[in-house]
Amino acid sequence: MNILIFGGSGKMGAAVAWDLVKQADVESVGLVGRNEDSLKKTANWVNSSKIRLHTLDIMDVEASKALMEAYDVGVSTLPDRRTSYRVVDTAIQAGLDIVDMLEEYHRRPDPYEVEGLEKPEGMSLNEYGDWLHEEALAKNVTFLDGIGFAPGISNITVGEGIRKLDQADCAVARVGGIPSKEAADRHPLRYMITWAFDHVLREYMIRLNVIKDGKIVEVDASSECEGFKFTKFGQNEVLECAITPGMPSFLYTRPELQEFAEKTVRWPGHWEGIKTLKEIGMLDLEPVEIQGIKIAPRDFLLAVIEPKLQPLEGDTDVCVMWNTVTGTKDGKKHRIDYYLWDEADTELGISSMARVTGFSAAIGALFIGRGKITKKGIVPPEDAFDSELYEDFLDELELRNISILEEITPLG
């Protein structure tokens, strides 16, 4: 098969490419980006004769369509909603099966901070999402939507937990990419950039939907902070998590849930710092005037803080997950927990975030190309990886030294 990666010069795109070129049934891997030098840098690092470089502005729809005709599956690793939607829209029109790792659920785009997302004139966001789904069905396209770490692994494990129960009542996903403990102490907010930080701040600020008492309700991001101790995989760390706009597909694909939320994991102190920044207005987008110059407080903050959050020499990251599903099985209450603790591959120079995100997207593309995932339209991970494919997915993760621990506990 031939697989085309959009955003091929970024860290996530590079990780996807590194994984794909090692598969015997992958003949070529195309890298798409606007900067030829950046693409060459990725190609040199991947170091495979299977790599093909394509310098292209993805906003050029006709050129993108023409390129897509030479490939079997596409992977979007782009860092914002404007480019993400453009690529998947174009792929659907071109009849190309596509995997996207950024957006949580294209069929129901959240209305906050749309990041330049362009939709057909006269359509609401929800109408656009439904239109994309119907177009994909009409074009016989599989659009695997939100496949990485979170969304992605988190959706797949929570979906499996729900399937294992006769009746699932509550699901909480706790996921996040954090610096190693040593690196956290060297950075403000005990945080280090492993993902597009402007997009991270967006997810701290918007309002989002969760399920409470069986109803969809809107809450503030960064709320309901919860502390916990992570003791699996030989760890013994105190962490915190707060609600963020992750995995909203469950509001629609698993409406039987009485409670549902996704929370982002951070080191203690991070969420208190974010709360302070929110309270003083530093994360606002409304411009303020400073010495005759208008600038959004968040843009100013990004300019100041991003350099201080970049990894220093020797810094590594960790990805952590603790997902919980509760409900009944054979008339008795049960809790099912899923755990992950993944560290960076320092030998290869691949961050943990790139491993769990990029490798998951690569597996998704491979499963489509191999005919394992056949559902058409917009397909969220919890539906794409059903009971049969769930074990196959875990096996593929294990081949990449990523382990998921499942624990089932009767409750009384």
Q: Model features per residue range: what roles?
A:
Residues 5-19:
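N-terminal Rossmann NAD(P)H-binding glycine-rich loop of SDR-like oxidoreductase domains
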Residues 28-30:
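Short beta-strand element of Class I
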Residues 35-37:
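Helix N-cap at the beta1-alpha1 junction of Rossmann-like dinucleotide-binding domains, i.e.
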Residues 66-70, 82-103:
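Rossmann-fold NAD(P) dinucleotide-binding segment
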Residues 101-141:
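Rossmann-fold NAD(P)-binding glycine/threonine-rich loop
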Residues 163-412:
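C-terminal catalytic/substrate-binding lobe primarily of soluble NAD(P)-dependent oxidoreductases
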